[in-house]
Every structure is written in C-alpha cells, then in structure tokens.
Amino acid sequence: MELSPRAAELTNLFESRIRNFYANFQVDEIGRVVSVGDGIAQVYGLNEIQAGEMVLFANGVKGMALNLENENVGIVVFGGDTAIKEGDLVKRTGSIVDVPAGKAMLGRVVDAMGVPIDGKGALSDHEQRRVEVKAPGILERKSVHEPMQTGLKAVDSLVPIGRGQRELLIGDRQTGKTTIAIDTILNQKQINSRATSESETMYCVYVAIGQKRSTVGQLIQTLEEANALEYSILVAATASDPAPLQFLAPYSGCAMGEYFRDNGMHALIIYDDLSKQAVAYRQMSLLLRRPPGREAFPGDVFYLHSRLLERAAKRSDQTGAGSLTALPVIETQAGDVSAYIPTNVISITDGQICLETELFYRGIRPAINVGLSVSRVGSAAQLKAMKQVCGSLKLELAQYREVAAFAQFGSDLDAATQALLNRGARLTEVLKQPQYAPLPIEKQILVIYAAVNGFCDRMPLDRISQYEKAILNSVKPELLQALKGGLTNERKMELDAFLKERALALI
C-alpha cells in the first residue's frame, strides 16, 4: 500500500521529532533528616556533597555541610531549626556558600548571609563572592608602605598601622576597643574627602559578632550622624542569631572587603570580636561531636582565625595594588593575654594594641598600654614628619613608667628624675583624646611636637587640653600642610616661635 504525500510528510515529521526528542529533566540529589537539634542537622543520603556546600531544607531554611561522615552528613542550620523535623527532605544546591559584594553594599546593614536587614529594600547591582577563598600568595603581595591613619594620637605616633596590616585590639570588656575601631572609621571621612582618585579612598567593613542589637543600633546611629555610613558596610550577627551565623559573619565581611582589595581599592575591616566567633565555633564543633582540645576548643581553632586574617594583605602592583587592612578585636578575661585565643591571634597578627582597665579608670583614654603595644610593620608606613617627632616619645614614656613605679616609695628625688616625671605626665596627658573626635595627621604632628620639645613642661596638667585647642585653632593652614612633608630647620624655627608664644599665654 502506497502512502499519500501528506501521510509520508507526517511520517517523516514524526520520525525526526522522535530522533531529536530530549527530555530535560532536573535531577536533584536529596537526603533526609535523621536528627535535628541545637542548630545541627544529621542528614542521610547526600553521598556526593562537598564540604562547605550550601543545602536547602524543605521549609526554605539554608544550611552548610561541615561534617562528612560514612553514614550521615553533619549540617549547620543558618536560621531556626524548630520547623525542621525528622524525615524532612534536604536538597543539595551545588554551590559553596557565597555572599553579595560590590559598591551597592555601601551604606547597608546586612546579616551574615548578606541579606539586608536595614529595611532599605533589596540590593542593587552586585556580584556574588565565595565566603571561603584562599589568601593571596607570596608573589601577589607587597610589603606594607602606605599609612592607614586612625586619627588617634596614641596609635598613629606609637603603634602606627599601614594599609594591608593586621593589628589586634586586645583588652578586657569596657576598655574602649570598639571606640578605637569606630574612631578609625570616622577618621577615614576626612581622608576620603581629600582623595583625588578611587584608589586613594578607604572603604570600611564592620563585622559585629555576638553583640547586643541595641549596641549595633547605637553604632549605626553614630556612623549615620557622622556621614560615615556612605563608605561603610555593616555585617551583623547579633547575640540572638544562631551560632553558625556568628561563625560565618567574619568570612562574609571579609569577602565583601576583598572586592575592594582585588579591584585596586583600599578597605578596612573590623572584626568585633573574634572571641565570640571562637565560642560559636566551639559550640558547633562540640555539637558535631568533634574532639575537644585546650579550653574545650576544637583542634583547628587556630586555623579558624589564621585563614581569615591571612586574607588581609597589601597586593602587589601587578595585581592592582589594592589592600585590605584588618583590625580584629579580642576580649580578655581579667587581663589574661596568655589564654588560648588571645595568644593564637597575637601570633597571627602584625602587632597588637593592648588596652587596660586600670588606665581607663585613671582617665587615660584611649587606655593604651604603650609598653605592651607594638606594631611590627606599620613604622615603614609612618609619615616622615611623624617619625621625626616620635623618635624620643616612646623612650621617654618607657623611662617615665619605670621611674614612676619607684617614685611612689619616696619623695626625695633628684632634679633629673623630677624633670622626667614632669615630662612623662605631660606626654601622657597630650596622648589623651575624647571618643569620636579623630585628629588629622598634621594636627597630631603639631601637638606631639609641642609636647616632645618641652613647650608644655611648665604648664599645669589641667591646662594642656586648653593649650592643644589654642594651637590647633590659631595655626596657619599652610604651616599645617607643610608638616606632612617633613620638618626642615626653617619649619622648626617657625613652629618653635609660634608654640612658645601660645605657651607663654597659658603658663
């Protein structure tokens, strides 16, 4: 029987359709929850999952695979686990945990997953970056050589910080650690206003770990009032957030800061504080049944912080010359810097600023212990004029502390010792500074020059702050600008005449 032309055409059409038929099925690897509790879910069936991969629970909550065992996978839940039940389906996403990054993040407050929590709507144009990446290699780095000014006289003169450095802020609770960090963010306002190009601007990322929501709210208000939020990103994993989010927040903030570092820009990141991150990680590790070590922390708690802080770096000229400067904060208990976490972080960082309760209560604020505080690489980045002025400052303060300890026992001191005590008390007074009042570097140089060269020696202690205000208000702007370039003999003569005139008015 011969087919009609129409039937033959239909047959050919069906044959070609059958040959070209391809069913595009979406295949998901799924597992089932075996047990859940305390923010940890044990899941059976996810045989191909990667370490650090994101998973999705049936109720929409996300989680991350941390323990890969023979039978089950230990997953930390990023959110409430009350709605997750035994037998629920868990789906692999195929992607490692990532967060949004880019300039669209500036001025925003986000959680540890990068989701905005400030009520200003969704994020605009941004890119996704993995939270866990390898730190830049040796050849991709350059030694620190540009200053990162905090606006604090005691820090910029004695423990200078460079762009790309890691400087630890360590001290007991309520000693002013966060204040130093916030002052540093506020000080970038006047530096950014002078920046002529994008590569000179300093962007800031503040990561709040395990803090009260009220504290974070006050912080946002402080930054908003100073117009500092426009160049800052806030990542908040507060005390009420689950431990996995407190563990993740520093890595998320670091990924956001790395966007600027890798695109030839400069960023400052503050982790406030890493003690709480270590506690959150200990909680997760113990619930995942990992073996505990010293102080019940898991064996890899050093790696927890080292892999985070190594990502702060100054990039080489070939890779864009960007930088990421880190100011991690560690809270000590009763001044014990030899505990496990403090010693770990001290050994990882490029120096530390030690704050003491006793100094704080004596009214020396910022309460920096100059003897214990060091900056291992920052001096290479210090301005020439500041170096010239501060040469004798640290030595004189060290001699003062030594003599002051003995002076308590007797009053019959010779003239040289009396002069040393007198000078030391005035230098200590000059280094005091109110909170949220950072000073530009040229003004710091002027004030410290006056103190080091004896212009305050005959002045009563209670008049020193008055003298400081007087010289800062009446100095010529061109002389201030000239100070940045260094101290020549002509400038010294001009400065001496000006400072002497102002000092005589107050003695």
From Swiss-Prot:
It comes from the Eukaryota. Pfam families: ATP-synt_ab, ATP-synt_ab_C, ATP-synt_ab_N. Its main location: mitochondrion. CDD domains: ATP-synt_F1_alpha_C, ATP-synt_F1_alpha_N, F1-ATPase_alpha_CD. One of its GO terms (molecular function) is ATP binding. Coiled coil: none annotated. One of its GO terms (biological process) is proton motive force-driven ATP synthesis. ATP binds at G171, D172, R173, Q174, T175, G176, K177, T178. The record marks S373 as: Required for activity. InterPro entries: ATP_synth_asu-like_sf, ATP_synth_asu_C, ATP_synth_asu_C_sf, ATP_synth_F1_a_nt-bd_dom, ATP_synth_F1_asu, ATPase_a/bsu_AS, ATPase_F1/V1/A1_a/bsu_N, ATPase_F1/V1/A1_a/bsu_N_sf. One of its GO terms (cellular component) is proton-transporting ATP synthase complex. It is found in: Mitochondrion; Mitochondrion inner membrane. SUPFAM superfamilies: C-terminal domain of alpha and beta subunits of F1 ATP synthase, N-terminal domain of alpha and beta subunits of F1 ATP synthase, P-loop containing nucleoside triphosphate hydrolases. Keywords: ATP synthesis, ATP-binding, CF(1), Hydrogen ion transport, Ion transport, Membrane, Mitochondrion, Mitochondrion inner membrane, Nucleotide-binding, Transport. Mitochondrial membrane ATP synthase (F(1)F(0) ATP synthase or Complex V) produces ATP from ADP in the presence of a proton gradient across the membrane which is generated by electron transport complexes of the respiratory chain. F-type ATPases consist of two structural domains, F(1) - containing the extramembraneous catalytic core, and F(0) - containing the membrane proton channel, linked together by a central stalk and a peripheral stalk. During catalysis, ATP synthesis in the catalytic domain of F(1) is coupled via a rotary mechanism of the central stalk subunits to proton translocation. Belongs to the ATPase alpha/beta chains family. PANTHER family: ATP SYNTHASE SUBUNIT ALPHA, MITOCHONDRIAL. F-type ATPases have 2 components, CF(1) - the catalytic core - and CF(0) - the membrane proton channel. CF(1) has five subunits: alpha(3), beta(3), gamma(1), delta(1), epsilon(1). CF(0) has three main subunits: a, b and c. A stretch of 270 kb of the mitochondrial genome is duplicated within the centromere of chromosome 2 resulting in the duplication of the gene. The expression of this duplicated gene (At2g07698) is not demonstrated. It is also probably not RNA edited and therefore differs in all the positions known to be edited. This is ATP synthase subunit alpha, mitochondrial. It comes from Arabidopsis thaliana. The gene is ATPA.
